[in-house]
Amino acid sequence: MAENTELRRELWILGIKPGEGREDLLSSYLESGGYVCRLGQCENLESGRPLGIVLDISPFSEDGWGILLKIKSSPKTCNIPVLPVFLSVNGKIGGVFPVAGFFTLPVDEEYLQDRLAVYGLTEEAETWDLQSMVVSRSGEEKLSKAIERLGFDVIKGYTGKEALALASIHPVYMIFCAQMLPDMSAFELQERLRLDPYSSNTPLFVLLKDSMKDGERLALSRDVAHLVRKKQLSCEEFLGYLRRKE
């Protein structure tokens, strides 16, 4: 057992202030699934290099959105997988948001190509005519051109409702979506896409602005709170999300 533990890097829990104990239930769920985990700090990520991060982005977190932006803005930590979760003030797990990944704007084209190759999402573009969707108020022309150079056709949506309508007509291979759209967040768009059997497994990548004001981070946390459907997920429900993320 000790040997296996050494071979597997840890999952870190971030966004929780040490001493609060809000991570206790989450830790017990992870440990019951066979994962090694601990409460970590953002400043230790470069040296610690965890296998992945479970990040609290609720209104009760310790600047969860700020931590996410720091992780994804640094070349030394941006490729560490992050699973955002909603933890109540008492640490109950109310929601999990297993998006495929995050990119900060403006997206570096070489990094985009590398990450999509790691996810195995570029190979079939050489053989098949595949469509990707970019959902953003601005249209993200530079990103769209980079995706086209990887061999994908690009269709654009400017609101969440438009993206849902387009996805029902044109099945897409993957989606890039701004974190906040005029009518919904990227997480809400993903929740709605999962209700449609034709788009339930479509990878969705979230596009983060390169900086966020305090008010923006608070608004994002409150928006996530509206997506919470249960007071507490069971251990099996939570681990199911985590396994799909792997």
For each feature predicted by the language model, list its residue ranges.
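Helix-enriched interaction subdomains in cytosolic or periplasmic regions
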Residues: C78-L112
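Conserved phosphotransfer microenvironments
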Residues: E23, Q41-N90, C177-L195, S200-N201, ...
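Non-catalytic signal-transmission and effector/linker regions of two-component phosphorelay proteins
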Residues: M1-L51, P75, D108-E141, K161, ...
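As written
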Residues: G94-F103, A186, E216-R229
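Eukaryotic modular interaction domains in large regulatory/scaffold proteins
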Residues: I147, D153-A163, F176
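Alpha-helical segments within the soluble intracellular
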Residues: E31, I147-E148
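Conserved acidic residues
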Residues: P50-G52, A100, V172-M174, A225
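Short beta-strand/turn micro-motifs composed of small residues
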Residues: G15-K17, L55, F86, V134-R137, ...
